[in-house]
Amino acid sequence: IKGLQCIVDIDDALHLGVKQAALNVTLDQLVNWRADSGRFSRQIDGETVYFHSDYVEHIDSQLKRLTDAGVVNSLIIYNRIPGSRVGSPLVHPYTDLAKSPFHVGAFNLATEEGVRMYRGAIEFLADRYSNPRREHGLAKRFIIGNEIQSHWHWYNLGEMPHRQVVEEYHRALRVAHLAAHSIHPGIQLFISLDHHWSAQMGENTLHGMSGKYFVETLNTIAKAEGNFDWHVAFHPYPENLFNPRTWEDTAATPSFDAAKITFKNIEMLPAFLRHKRFLHNGKARRVILSEQGFHS
């Protein structure tokens, strides 16, 4: 099945025969946290969360065309921090605004206002884009964050121990699950992982962890607090991002302890998730390949 992410030209995508698409939704562009009025809003615990109308209309225009063409759509929901966000309830208090390499931070589930804004955003997206009438387009896959095990780069929580990172992310994932399923129980929630499996990106253990540790720890925490149906959006980039010959990947071995999982050994991921301890109601977690490519 042919898929495309970060679609620039929908006509081109449809001419390519794309059947699946992943669209980025950035929380800071969606939530108008300074507003006290607006066209788009949602009530959360007696408070009103407002949304930027131009951004909502932008999502509508993309999703509607793709949906009408029969494309299955996913939303990648993440927290971009393009500049200073002093006072923003969207920014996690542990996010290192100055040093975040790619200006992508964690969702703020540490304050009451942050939870309200985040929950409002998820409920709004679920309500608008899971409606069977498909008036604004259809997207029933929500990918929460980006490449979480390499959090320093793509879900910045500052310098933080592994277990605490997973606990923080679990909170965001569970709130998203509860919020989305309060609107439509058919929405699927996905975690996001890069190709590092038993290895981690870089050497600083406060900047990242292995994908295997992240999945195992998330599963343990989720089961302890009440299991739910999360799934995996995986990025099977080649071992060397500048070498598309993935069959030459030496770190992608046929083992559950492989340093990396790429297209060469991609079968290891669904096989690992079929272990009994990862099942939910007797069913294995779904795996989608939501991002992959090559540098040039």
Model-predicted segments: where are they?
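Noncatalytic carbohydrate-binding groove/subsite architecture in carbohydrate-active enzymes
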Residues: 69, 115-127, 132, 138, ...
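N-terminal substrate-binding region of glycoside hydrolase catalytic domains
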Residues: 1-130, 134-137, 141-144, 148-161, ...
